[in-house]
A protein has these predicted regions:
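Hydrophobic alpha-helical
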Residues: 114-132, 198, 218-280
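Flexible loop/hinge segments that line or gate small-molecule binding clefts
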Residues: 122-160, 178, 275-283, 287-288
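Hinge/cleft segment of the Venus flytrap/periplasmic-binding protein
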Residues: 4, 17-24, 34-35, 189-190, ...
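An alpha-beta-alpha
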Residues: 51, 70, 164-206, 212-216, ...
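Hinge/beta->alpha junction and helix N-cap segments in small-molecule ligand-binding domains
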Residues: 55-67, 86-98, 120, 154-164, ...
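Exported/periplasmic ABC-transporter solute-binding proteins
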Residues: 241-248, 255-322, 326-335
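Signal peptide-proximal N-terminal region
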Residues: 68-86, 203-208
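Short, low-complexity disordered leader/linker segments with a strong preference
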Residues: 1-49, 130-134, 343-344
Length: 347
């Protein structure tokens, strides 16, 4: 008996393997031609995306608007075939440490991406660098970070917003007079940018405007803002022609103080961010300018930007959501209604 008549077992296996390769290749080719295999492989890329959204807080309408914008984006993406889940987590207390704990919890999970509105730029960015080896993409909403990983910053140009406020003040007092800047609080990078933009524009464009005070802070409560505002009016009430309050709390607190001093409508007030109180004051002429952003649009664009990046698109460094100056003349316009979230369908 020869080797040809009775081959060893391993030769039988090799012949069987060679025979099997032909039909398998034919099957795969048929699947590709029929479009079955690409569709099957595509399903692997259609797993549900999990995107965490971490706001500065959960007890203010601004953050709820960001949440609603994010949900709107997820609903539209679902209709386009992108399965997506929004995980919303914040704290009612305005605590930097608690926010970092929330982000730490999320970064330890299997997420597709994360959206963050940070409290403290320096402190938060330092914490993020510890985890910079992670490939978790992040988009920063409302405030930016000097972080190392690829990110996008979806927010308003706050420096430009401060310049817009300065121009409104300059227009109101015709380029001549005394003004007060009521700051928000130290560590708030958004407010600090607005304040810097205001000061720079006054100095560069309005040489006949004198800044009486630029070192007082309203803080994060109406009561403190009102107290500081009364101090400023006690000291400068007979001299001041116009005031810029760089925060929601400062605007409402200063408005209350102007009313108490019978100066509302006589001393011009330009504020930032909208409340029912401040909007009514615009209508009745007690506030002559109100800078408003569009948090709904921020949430919407943050999600769509992040998903585009996850799907292979280029993530822009900055997505500017714009700022609107609200006055008595335009408060009922569609532009203002959209910025205030009253006409979100126009997105």
């Amino acid at each position: 008996m020869t080797l040809k008549d009775n081959p060893p077992p391993f030769l039988h296996f090799r012949r069987f393997e060679a025979l099997m390769q032909v039909p398998l290749l034919a099957i795969l080719t048929a699947f590709i031609v029929a479009g079955i295999l690409p569709n099957a492989l595509g399903q692997l890329g259609n797993a549900e995306l999990s995107i965490a959204v971490v706001p500065k807080g959960t007890d203010r309408e601004r953050w709820n608007a960001i949440h609603q914008g994010a949900l709107r984006a997820s609903e539209e993406l679902e209709r386009e075939g992108v399965s997506i889940k929004i995980l919303w987590k914040g704290d009612t207390a305005t605590s930097r440490d608690k926010q970092i704990q929330v982000v730490d919890t999320f970064t330890g999970q299997r997420l597709s991406g994360i959206l963050v509105a940070s409290f403290d730029e320096d402190k938060f960015a330092g914490r993020i660098r510890i985890d910079r080896g992670s490939d978790l993409p992040m988009v920063y909403i409302d405030s930016g970070l000097d972080a190392d990983r690829p990110i996008s910053y979806v927010a308003t140009d706050n420096f430009e917003g401060g310049a817009v406020a300065a121009d409104r003040v300059g227009q109101l007092i015709e380029g001549v007079g005394n003004v007060i800047l009521l700051r928000h609080q130290q560590g708030d990078s958004n407010a600090e940018a607005r304040e810097a933009g205001f000061i720079e524009r006054i100095k560069s464009s309005y040489p006949s405007i004198r800044m009486l005070s630029i070192d007082q802070y309203s803080g994060d409560s109406f009561s403190n803002a009102n107290r500081v505002s009364e101090y400023l009016l006690n000291r400068y009430g007979r001299l001041v022609n116009a005031i810029f309050a760089s925060s929601l709390q400062g605007t409402d607190g200063m408005l209350g103080a102007l009313r108490d001093f019978d100066l509302a409508g006589q001393v011009f007030l330009v504020g930032h961010d909208a409340s029912d109180t401040s909007l009514e004051a615009v209508r009745n002429g007690e506030i002559q300018g109100l800078l408003v952003t569009n948090p709904y649009k921020m949430g919407y664009l943050a999600v769509t930007t992040l998903v585009d990046h996850i799907q292979g698109g280029n993530m822009p460094t900055i997505v500017d959501t714009g700022i609107t100056l609200v006055t008595m003349a335009n408060i009922e316009s569609d532009e203002v209604k959209e910025a205030l979230g009253a006409s979100s369908e126009s997105l």
